[in-house]
Structures are given as structure tokens and as C-alpha cells.
Amino acid sequence: TATVRMLIKNCDYSNDAIECMLETATASDLPAHLRKEVQDAISSNIDFLKGKNKFCNKIREKIYHFEKARDSDWCIGDDEMNWLKNLLEAILPDDIIEANLWKFKAFLPVYELRRREDDIRKWTEKQLSFRVAAVKELYKRIGFDGLRKIAEKSEDKYQTGLAFAKFKTTYPMIDFVINEGFDNQLLAGFFISLFNTNKERYWKVVRKYNNRNDILISIGTNEELTRFVETLPEEAKENYWKTVSVWCYSDDTLNIMAEQLLKVGRSGDVLSLLCRVNYGGKDIPVAPAFNA
């Protein structure tokens, strides 16, 4: 009791002190009345937390943590859970980009997305729909400028690209994604989604942009793309195989992929590729590639 009250009395509300207070305010091994004293102290000094995503993210993680454990003896009660949720609402950033930035993290601490209730596919779909809703809001409020800013600041570029594509793949949207100079992972997310949902439009974009390499390598390798690359001028073909990722491939292209990677001097990547194939338990003949 004395230690907790000393913490409250001496708190200078620096970032480190606030983190300590948040931990104490939800510590399951403390009596509820002591947690309440810390919670009241935080609520009385809320301006120190306002607009800081660091604390917003911390509170979201705690809400997620306790929502998953609602039936546990050590879980905080409904009143304390409501305190956390109300605190989060009160300190959210006013800036729309900062307020939505957390939705583009690699992991979304949202209690509605509990893994234990869903398989991985459904979990992934829920996360994507959550991000798409944020993209729609940003576009509605501030247009392409909002998408540009969230793309620049997002943690998970690939998932951001997927959300952009799920939102819309109109030609103005495609031109925006291509011309902004975004991260390659964002391009990969966007164009993999486009290729899987509208191949005809993907190929039209490839032709419109004169077989630009970043559009081609964004979807990795597959049989259809590999055949197309073979029709390109030698310099363009070499550029593709020098830069394409070995982490995105299809089983039907493994031989030609290994062969072409060796031709451009990527023997280390070939070994990495074959190790992953072997680890996956696939029986795929790749010996011809080493005889090229």
C-alpha cells in the first residue's frame, strides 16, 4: 500500500513514469482498491497522455490481453475494463493519420480478432477488412493525401498495400500507387491482390508502364509471369531475375527459377530456395538447374 501511494505521490508523469503507472493500474496481483487509486491519479492527469500513440497502443494491448482472459480469476472486472476503454477514447490523437496509424501495425491488438475463436484465414480476413475500413475513412476525409501519409508511416507495408487494393483498383488508384515511389513491400501487397482478383487489369497495367520491373517483381514468380518474362528483351529479363524475391514462388516454376537465378549469379538464393523446398517436404526435381 505504501509503495503504491508513494508511486502516485512522486509520479512526474514522464513517459517512463506513465508506463509504470499504467502497469500498476492493471496489475492483477494488487488489490482492486489500490488499482483504483492509481487509475484515479492517471485520470486526473490525462493531459500527459493525450495524443501519444505510445500510450494508446499500450492501453489497446491491455484491453486485448484482458478481453482474451475474461473468464480467468485474475482478470480485471468490468468497471476497470470500462476505465481502460474510456481512457483510450479520451487520449486518442486528434490528427486523423495518427489516430489510424495503429491499424497498420503488423499485429492488431483488437479484442474482436481473437485467434482462439477463428482459424488463420478468417483472422487474416478480419484484419484486412479492419484496415480497409480505415483506408476508406482516410480517403473520404483527405483523399490521396491521406493514403500517402498512412503509407509513409505504416509499420506493415505489405498489409497496407493489400488494404489499398481491397479498397479500390481503379486506374487512378493504380497510378497513384505506382507513381508515389512507395516501398516495394507495399507494391507487392497491392499487385499480388490485383493479380489474384483481376489478372486482365494487371497485364494492362504492365503494358501501360512498358513492362516496368517493379510491377513485375512485385508478385514474385508464377508460371504465367515466367512465360511473359521470357519474351522480354535480354536486359529486361536479366533485370527481373536479378531483383525478384525468392520468397514468393510457385511449385511449377522452381526449375526455371533456379536456372535463371544461377545465370545471374544468385547461387546463394538458389540454395536458400532449395532449403525451403526441402524443409516443406516437397519432392521437386531441381537437379537440371545445376546443369545449366
What are these regions (language model features)?
Residues 1-292:
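Non-catalytic all-alpha helical scaffold/repeat segments
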